[in-house]
Amino acid sequence: MQTKIFYLILFLLTAIFSNIQSNDFLTLQSTTSTRDSGFYDFILPEFKKKFNIDVRVVAVGTGQAIKNSENCDADLLIAHHKESELKLINNGFGLYRKEFMYNDYILVGPKSDPAFLKNNVSIESALEKIQNHKLLFISRGDDSGTNKKELSLWKKINFLPNPQTDKWYLSVGQGMGASLNMAVNKNAYLITDRATWISFKNKRDHAILVENEPLLYNFYGVIPINPEKCPNVKYNESKKFINWLLDTKTKEKINSYKLNNQQLFFTNIKK
């Protein structure tokens, strides 16, 4: 009898301990660029050290990350397409948005530059040249923040690419790394975020051709998921994370992150 009681108590203690352990993490739906650049590996150990809370990152395109958040598969969201993020808030799933850092987009292509883009052309002029000369262009085509940004830039020159009829425009449905590899292998043009480009090792004969334009700024926002819509959300832990992310020391940490002696993200937000 005593043996049965002992094992029952042991079982209950194990269940309680497991439940406590299982709550010591946050699920963060995220864009892929912050993961692929090594950003989370750089900053998240500091959060874990301070609060003893793990952050489990689910890195997908921004569109999918928002869908996952609407399915209540998140405590937090980090994305980089403000219009889509505000829609999540307006639909009641996100509570608010805090913009906390930025980098920028760039247009990369073959160093031979058949479109002659490197002569200080604007991004609109560059895309017009690519379209007019029907030069091979790779689009992520995955509803990510980068894909949405790219399409908005085509819209500025009153052009909507159609992969069915515009054979030079390849919509590949892939993440940033795979899309970059394809662009390099096919000698094609592509829009990418700078952080992923800096960390990308297979550049070969590709180079940055258009950069440093206000139109190409890339802003990142963090959004806590609404516990009234998603009862399992760990809201108190989410608040801790956001307050920590916006803290001066964390901003200094983010600004210090470099690869190849180049800063990847900036917390002094430009407007």
Describe the predicted segments one by one.
Residues L76-Y102:
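Acidic, polar ligand-binding/catalytic clefts
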Residues L107:
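Serine endopeptidase catalytic core focused on the charge-relay Asp
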Residues Y7-I16:
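Bacterial N-terminal signal peptides
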Residues S18-S22:
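Boundary at the C-terminal end of the N-terminal hydrophobic targeting segment
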Residues N23-K50, G63, K67, D73, ...:
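Exported/periplasmic ABC-transporter solute-binding proteins
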Residues M1-Y7:
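Bacterial N-terminal signal peptides that target proteins for export
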